[in-house]
UniProtKB/Swiss-Prot annotation:
Coiled coil: none annotated. It holds the Pfam family zf-C2H2. This is Zinc finger protein 687a. It comes from Danio rerio (Zebrafish). The lineage of its organism: Eukaryota, Metazoa, Chordata, Craniata, Vertebrata. It comes from the Eukaryota. The gene is znf687a. Keywords: DNA-binding, Metal-binding, Nucleus, Repeat, Transcription, Transcription regulation, Zinc, Zinc-finger. A zinc finger (C2H2-type) spans 587-619, 696-719, 817-840, 854-876, 885-908, 958-981, 988-1011, 1018-1044, 1137-1160, 1210-1232. Residues 24-387, 907-953, 1045-1093 are annotated as: Disordered. The keyword Protease does not apply. Its main location: nucleus.
Amino acid sequence: MGDMKTPDFDDLLAAFDIPDIDAKEAIQSDTHGNHNEHSSVVGKERSGSPSLRPSGSPDPPHNDPSVVSVIVKNSVHSDDKAEGNETGEFSSADESQKSPQKGPSKDSSVPTDPFIYNGLKSVSDGSTESPPSLDLAPGQHNGPLWSLSASKATGDDDKHNDAFTNHPASTFQSLPLSNHPSVSSHLISPNFSSKVDSEEAQAINGTLRAGVRRHQSEDEESEPDLGSPALVIQESPISQLCPAPKVPRMQRSPSSVFQPPSPSSPSLPVSNTQMEEPSVQHPKLHSSTNPTSLTSTNNLPVEEKDLEHIIEERDSPESPEPEISQSRTSLPSNSQGAIESKQRITREEAPQDEVMDVSMQEKVDYGAEATEGKSTEPTLVESASDAISNSASSKPLKMRIKTVKKPVVSITRTVSKAATKGGASKGSGASKVQAVARKSLQKIPRSVASPQLLSQSTKVAMLPVSTLQDASTAMLFAASRAQNQMPTALSATAVNITRTSNLPSISSSSIPGVNVRAASGQKTNTGTAKPASIVNSPGAVISRSQSSLVEAFNKILNSKNPLPSYQPDLTSLPPPEWGLRLPSTGYRCLECGDAFALERSLARHYDRRSMRIEVTCNHCSKRLAFFNKCSLLLHAREHKEKGLVMQCSHLVMSPVSVEQMIGQQDTVPIGVLSPAVSALSAIKESGVNLSQSSDHSCPECWSTFKGKQELVAHFQEVEPGGTDTCCLQCSPPMPLWNSCCAAAHRRMHQQLPPLVCPECGLICQTHELNTHLKQTCLHYSRRLGYKCACCHLVFGGVNSQNAVKTHMQTAHCEIFHKCPSCPMAFKSSSGAESHCASQHPELSESARQSKEIYKCVMCRTVFTQKSLLSVHIDTHLTKQKMHVFKCPDCNKLFTQRTSLLEHVKDTHRETSNHDGTSTQNSLVKMESSDGEEWGRDEEEDKGKVSDANSAVPRSQSWSCSQCQTHYTDKENYISHMTEQHGKELKKFPCTLCEGSFSSSSSLRRHIRVKHKGIKRVFYCQLCTGEKRSFSSKLILEKHIQAQHAGERGTATQSQAVPQFTDGADSSSEHDAGVLGGSSVEPESRLAESTLTRRIKGAPVGEQEAKGLRCMPCGFTTEDREEFLQHIVCHRDGGSGAQCQQCGACFASSSSLSRHLFISHRVRDSPSDHAEAALHTCATSVASDSAAAGGSPGSPLSVVGGLLEDGEGKHICKVCGRYFSKPADLNTHFRTHGMAFITAYKTDKPA
């Protein structure tokens, strides 16, 4: 079906509920202990050309990627009475052709009796002796199979043993030698033994033994079969080029079940003329000189073996089909084709022979056991289920039919039966088997061992071979014929199989060159399938013809495409204006190998209607309908991608009318959707589930939903442990929160259709998916974060785990000082020392040293080392994982995806002329790994401040100068530079150059100084001579301490920023703590100075650094009284918090005290300054309040926070921000904390 590779089948087999037979019990059931020899011989006999398969090596097609398994589970009613061992019973004419020297087997009726292989009788010393005749029944063989001594001593017999094939499921009589003298004489010729070397036999035996070991290991992996033998049904057209060892297993239960005959068909079809005259080919047989062909010629006399071992056979999935028919392998290609054609046509006609000759059963009595000593060859068991269904009591029989698609292997189907523990007598069971076998042998000879038997037993008309070349055509033809013969109670929309449903009986015709292997690991015989009763549920028994339906189902799934795979001609590309993007190999169907130039054609391919297959998928828990095998296998492949093998039941197949085949509606292909199409229509139109009735379904698990919102919620649902799985291909690793999202995300990396958005379930094309993920759903913004269990602080980013650990250890974990002599612990070392001095005075000073212990805040566990606590906290962090969402534009983190979408919509997707900025209500308090609080970044005024002036550019883009690539995601850029160019970048890379920094403040300072040319300058106000400037506040402080120590109390410091813009000023608030070693409040003098410069327009260069300088307006004087009278004009709103050193106003006395200590190093109480200020400005409060222009009830009017410039814009008095509306200014003013609280208290009515 394709050339894709899949995981090893053994790995898949271990994950499924496949009954098996315990190999140990099967070995114990052999009373003679000939398991190894038996397995090797049978494996070798089934190997037409063992040299084609190296010893111990797995089958090359074993890892074929296109292998998609489908398991059909049903149950069957079986007898309470255990069926006896099947033994062959020959007619008198056939027995007359047997050699009189055939060694009898006394225990041939016992199920555990080993075989006598190819007439080689075992002796005590381990060697073999050969009877005179070659046409012998199977016998025992206890010695080494292929020893040099045995091969030299026995000559021809070893060669015959190498050539013979005791077919496990062959139930026909051996080909009479008397009817073909030329063949007989050739077989008996002593010169034949010289054609095969004994060393070659030993090499082949080694290969077989390796296959035995491989096979036993696979059986041990399977699930026990509850003490029941395996009912094996197989159908396998085997190519003569790839046979391999087949390992049988001994029966472990006294009860046995039946095995249908299945001599395989050759790979070459022949005409009807060859079928009618097969004897013409015998001279060609005699003239053949190929040693392999000569060796296989000996297969003619021995056609069958004891059926008990057929029942227990289980093969490795990598082994080819064991059913290499003796007739087929012994005859040349023409004769083989004749037999194959006749077998196939006979089996095609078999469904017409529904009426069995019941009278034949009465002719068989229990005396048939007398013939078992002469031959253990079982007869055809076509109606073996009669022995089951006619029993007095019945118990459920569990059927598992597992079909595996493989390009060039054999088709097998394995049915395992859970039989009852108690068994009836072996003799009665064997007689019953013989009776049923006789009846089916005469009435339904679907597969024969020779053309002569075919001509004697076949009584039905032959169908043309050309009408049954395709499996689907065969199914439709036989189904229509079955419908004409019997009424069917099947509805087109059947959800369950009813009791009276008569499903079409389809025989599986052999198609030359088609090889399929059994996914269940069991190789079984084919040819004619035993019509076992398939039970839907206990009590609902379906007719025996259902087995033919199962055969047809397997034939359809595993049939070879009658036409070669279609490959479009993509050498000439379509015109660019068409907008078609064609892959190099086209859009390929992974199930059948066909490729198409257009994706719509692939969708039509999946939607074609050739039949109707209804199954109940056990994984999806729903009834599904498929109209072609590709759609069914596509559904099975999707389960396979999740590590599951599709298991289904309630199989119903029905043909479709010609009108439905050619008159179907056009479908929307998978993925052919434009971005404008909503997720609702996308999911509605592009569902691959052909039987789905709902418009909203998950493309991954096929769950149906009522609407789009439920589908989105389904993809957003976080499963338990969803934070434990991450995609390692993404950088940083992307958390996969549920199975559907994980499957869709992994398929994006593989670029396999359908491409589904992991966030909302929308199906998109390749070129549309990236745009949808980055702009609509923001899939790549999802990050793995950690939440502190104590304060619910959320940490996100690259080092979020280390950050939350550090936070928990420093903020919440307690440190105690433990007494070295007793269990007492104290929170301080002084307390521990006092305790030791008072309670343990005998301890020396060095022994009194307390020891620090660390207590986990979450589980109260105490550790003696801090490193142990850190390791312990990791165990708690596994439960504290959560998903956070990082804004791709400003790096803010959000705990909810909806909050991120609202933030992006309101902040980054609106026009630059937006009047205001909405409040981020959903933003929670979050910290980056370096301790910054992301939620405390103040909003920027978009109408006034450009993106280039913001701390982090709005539209971030990093470019690699070496390979000229651009990245919008910072992590991807860092990973690219590390992996491709070996450059280790820090957490905050610059967007304008290749520099990187460890903190955002350092990055802002770098952008401001290096790229904008804006330098922050600090002037010394105490230097009366030449103007002294300093690059940092710390250097200025050192200068003042060294040069102006005595003048520090009356000095003020100022900073001059000649080229500062509004954005630089606003960002400098955050940098003040880094540059000056202190944390400046938003009500700082810098903001006041900026506001004054905006209003007054006083240039900074004109302000002289001498005497007392007014910070708001830049007024400078040496007279303090004059200075105090001047600064009163800046006190608006009656506030009494004004700095007497620089004139800056504050909303509260605590802010003023902090300002005095930080800026002026003054610890005096601000009450004196407040009283002086109130005394000097009593007359100006009313006028200043009126000039403020605020409403009487507005807090801004109280503190003078609302100012209006010449352009009619409103300015915040605290920080100097511009706003176009009073409402926006009022909202912004709340961010100033204490200033807003003070204004609110002042404005509150008494």
